[in-house]
């Protein structure tokens, strides 16, 4: 087998591989000899079929198997033998001339093919001692736990029907149909909708106009969708809702005790508080980690500047762009609504893709040098966590999909590996803990945001794409935005 380099430009490579006709013939004859004792051909005793007769019958199909074997087995070894790592699966280029292909299958000529690929650049790992990050720490006060426990208790609160007028805090059961300019709009209708007045679950002004109504009342509610409403075709428009009040209920006494916890399936109020505290600490801990990770990645980004494989960048960009356009479409928004243009957004997201690929290569090299791995046990735990995100009736199907799909498992392994590399780095760099308030921790850190973000990144439609690839900014938990309300839920 002869290997000749025909292109070496930047990260791009093309090599020509020539397998002499004699080598192809030897591989074919080995297959024919092996098949001689296995095939059954009328007129011949088992094991007595002449090789040349076998060649006449099976020669081309066996030679095709030889070709596939060479392509499958030699591609990786050839590139590894050159001391290179391919960024993606190499493109295999073979002759398109039918006569030439026939000669190869007949064993009458050398087999030539080309491999077209990009290499992973050599990355020299730098000293980490100069990297310094600040870790914001929020000590969750008891008052925070008390507030959340109260919200949990309120969600389980009982209501009793009443005959009087609805007041703030009462719950109403309503049917409604929303209209704009006299025409009903998609997602603007509901039946037997339970609504606690004052909960701000519906768009501003809706609940206020139902105060004072009684069961059996019909009420026309007029509201204006907020200018920043997620469904752009509804934003800023006035709408009327024909509402039928079917029932008014008053809340029962709010009790926060062991009995409340037992009604929620827990043994005691103390256990409920433990669970709530754990959830809150995990939430804020996740926010703390994402901010630390962002600082770390920003400094790594500044420290490493090299050409990244264009095909990896293209693949990453396509993933980001698909997510962004899906989110925009789902929200009924356009790039103009996001205060940008498609051209500007493409340029910004391309820079984001370049950054992600470059940082991914740096983290992979750091992890490899440090011996970071994801164990089978860790992958199994990650798989179970992923499967639990599916509806109960789909979990077994999802589990089988991951178990039988190596690419899906690798996609699950990659972010786990990245997080372990980040953990490794946090043990190597200077980390200073600073106690902050809840507001400081939850505040968007504009100064720390990467310059590779697109303008839509500050909008809801683009945030999912930012967080999806475990980049430097995770979507932080925020209070549900007022405009995103039930009255137009399906229209968003």
UniProtKB/Swiss-Prot annotation:
Swiss-Prot/TrEMBL keywords: Cell cycle, Cell division, Chaperone, Cytoplasm, Isomerase, Rotamase
EC number(s) in its UniProt entry? Answer: 5.2.1.8
Basic and acidic residues bias: start-end ranges = 463-479
According to the UniProt entry, the note on domains is: Consists of 3 domains; the N-terminus binds the ribosome, the middle domain has PPIase activity, while the C-terminus has intrinsic chaperone activity on its own.
Q: Where is the PPIase FKBP-type domain?
A: 169-254
Instruction: Name the principal localization, coarsely classed.
Output: cytoplasm
Q: Which PROSITE patterns match?
A: FKBP_PPIASE
Residue ranges of region Disordered?
441-492
Instruction: Provide GO CC annotations from the record.
Output: cytoplasm
Q: Which reaction does it catalyse?
A: [protein]-peptidylproline (omega=180) = [protein]-peptidylproline (omega=0)
Family per record: Belongs to the FKBP-type PPIase family. Tig subfamily.
Q: What does this protein do?
A: Involved in protein export. Acts as a chaperone by maintaining the newly synthesized protein in an open conformation. Functions as a peptidyl-prolyl cis-trans isomerase.
* UniProt GO MF annotations: peptidyl-prolyl cis-trans isomerase activity; protein folding chaperone; ribosome binding
Q: Which GO terms describe its biological process?
A: 'de novo' cotranslational protein folding; cell division; chaperone-mediated protein folding; protein transport; protein unfolding
Q: Where is the composition biased (Basic residues)?
A: 480-492
The compartments listed are: Cytoplasm
The record's listing under Pfam families reads: FKBP_C, Trigger_C, Trigger_N
Q: What is this protein called?
A: Trigger factor
